[in-house]
Amino acid sequence: MPPYTVVYFPVRGRCAALRMLLADQGQSWKEEVVSMETWQEGSLKASCLYGQLPKFQDGDLTLYQSNTILRHLGRTLGLYGKDQREAALVDMVNDGVEDLRCKYLSLIYTNYEAGKDDYVKALPGQLKPFETLLSQNQGGKTFIVGDQISFADYNLLDLLLIHEVLAPGCLDAFPLLSAYVARLSARPKLKAFLASPEHVNLPINGNGKQ
């Protein structure tokens, strides 16, 4: 039986990054797909610590909050930098990813039609810090921190991929980010996962936007 179980809706959403991580690291996991009908029935929601998904099982350990799950996997699988300095930078990157993801989700779920144009216009300013971080790490030729992949790389990659869907060409002005997306997406196990039905057939969001 797989050591990990992901309990989530039939979307990529906040589980795309952790699925990318697991696939790229050669880990097996079980998916428990929750339909909206099941969720609205209420008993599962009531059993969840914060009343939301994803829920993640690692043996007898139950975790909620997608970034907590990523950090746990980072520690467990050696994806948290090689020392405390790198770990701090990984945390900083991941917090920056979360800031932009929250803005993205607000657009998608509350203001898509009216707010998309302004969001896309402001997007270069939101992406620039990540280009800067890459430029400061070995000329942007490896990962976002150090010379080993971290959980923040998977989270950032997912964020960039969904923004390429939202605003095609949004990375054209950021050569390091563009190359970073291509480089990480070409990792053999990750490339196979990104092309798999398990990923491709899932919508990005739960409301049909993207």
Curated annotation (Swiss-Prot):
Q: Gene name?
A: GSTP1
Q: Tell me which EC number(s) this protein carries.
A: 2.5.1.18
List modified residues, type N6-acetyllysine. 128
Protein name per UniProt: Glutathione S-transferase P
In this UniProt entry, the residues modified to N6-succinyllysine are 103, 116
* PTM-bearing positions, type Phosphothreonine: 62
| Similarity comment: family membership | Belongs to the GST superfamily. Pi family.
Enzyme class of the recorded protein, top EC level:
transferase
* Chain sites annotated for binding glutathione: 8, 14, 39, 45, 52-53, 65-66
Q: Which ranges does the record mark as transmembrane?
A: none
Which proteins does it associate with, and in what oligomeric form? Homodimer. Interacts with CDK5.
Subcellular location as annotated = Cytoplasm; Mitochondrion; Nucleus
Annotated GST N-terminal domain ranges read 2-81
